[in-house]
Amino acid sequence: MSSEPSASGKCVLYTTKGELQIELWAKECPKTVRSFLQSIQDGKWDGIVLGKVAEDAVWAPAGLCACSAEINGRLRFNRRGLVGMAPGQDQPFFTLASRGELDGRAVVFGTLVGQSVYRLMEIAQGEVGDDGKTFVYPAEVRRAEVTIPYFDGLSGQKRRAEPEQQAAPRPRKIATRVRLEYEESEDEASDPPLDVRIRAAHDILQDERLTDALHGDSPPPRPAEAPRGSDSAPCVASPDRRAEAAPPTDGPPSRCASLAGPAPASPGPVTDLAPQLSAREQGTLSSLAEFRCKRGGKNPLLG
């Protein structure tokens, strides 16, 4: 179980490499802690650099505060991250390892807490010059703040540091609206505007002109002519062909007449049918009658 007493004061150093939060044993080392806090209140830490590393410690500049010989057996240099100062030197330092040889010779009055120990180690790993002690790019303390003063009546006491002011919102850029105007040429201005209208399909189908064209009277179809040689055509010979094909009255009857048999009774004179047929049809019928007689009374179409 640790024998270290509880801390009673607190302060923060804001460096370029992060925050260093320090808890202070103000009850055990009142004079040293009061001098340390007073130096912060006076602004002595603002702008200083932690520019030296030596003897497993990072050193601050001398002359910032005074140290009294307040040795306490419960406070020892047994780890890294402790804040100490030697009487008569008045130069604070931060340990990087255990420094037991300083017990009884220097005063331990504070300790780093939280992530501050890792910030200290990062500072200690900075590049050093030829002497091996001085940092080439030291960490700078931008400002210091007392968060728990413990003591009353510290002169020039600062208020608790206000949070970093938020960056002012950038003004919103309003885009300029550009209106483009095109001048019309004389030819375009003289041309009358075109009235183009798009009609729907159902409007076109209801157009009377279109329906008249679709449903108008069309000429009657021409009747198909009966094929030549069809049985439907009447086999009627012209009067001239009948006279030629008729057998002579004198003498024995011809073979054609005997095969054809007696001529049927004519319903009337042939001349009555002739005017109803064209000359071409009459010629066709005469040819068929003659061919029938030559075939011996057989139907020329049926063979």
From Swiss-Prot:
Residue span, PPIase cyclophilin-type domain: 7-153
Xref: SUPFAM superfamilies: Cyclophilin-like
Pfam families with a match to the protein in the record: Pro_isomerase
The entry's keywords: Cytoplasm, Isomerase, mRNA processing, mRNA splicing, Nucleus, Rotamase, Spliceosome
Uppermost EC category: isomerase
Catalyzed chemical reaction(s): [protein]-peptidylproline (omega=180) = [protein]-peptidylproline (omega=0)
Gene Ontology terms: biological process: mRNA processing; protein folding; RNA splicing
Gene3D superfamilies found in the cross-reference section: Cyclophilin-like
GO MF: peptidyl-prolyl cis-trans isomerase activity
Annotated spans, Disordered: 155-195, 208-274
Cellular component GO terms, alphabetical: catalytic step 2 spliceosome; cytoplasm
Subcellular location: Cytoplasm; Nucleus
Keyword presence, Nucleus: yes
E.C. designation(s): 5.2.1.8
Keyword Cell membrane tagged: no
Subunit structure: Associated with the spliceosome.
PANTHER family, sorted: PEPTIDYL-PROLYL CIS-TRANS ISOMERASE-RELATED (PTHR45625), SPLICEOSOME-ASSOCIATED PROTEIN CWC27 HOMOLOG (PTHR45625:SF6)
Family named by the database record: Belongs to the cyclophilin-type PPIase family. CWC27 subfamily.
Name the record gives this protein: Peptidyl-prolyl isomerase CWC27
Originating species: Eremothecium gossypii (strain ATCC 10895 / CBS 109.51 / FGSC 9923 / NRRL Y-1056) (Yeast)
Lineage: Eukaryota, Fungi, Dikarya, Ascomycota, Saccharomycotina
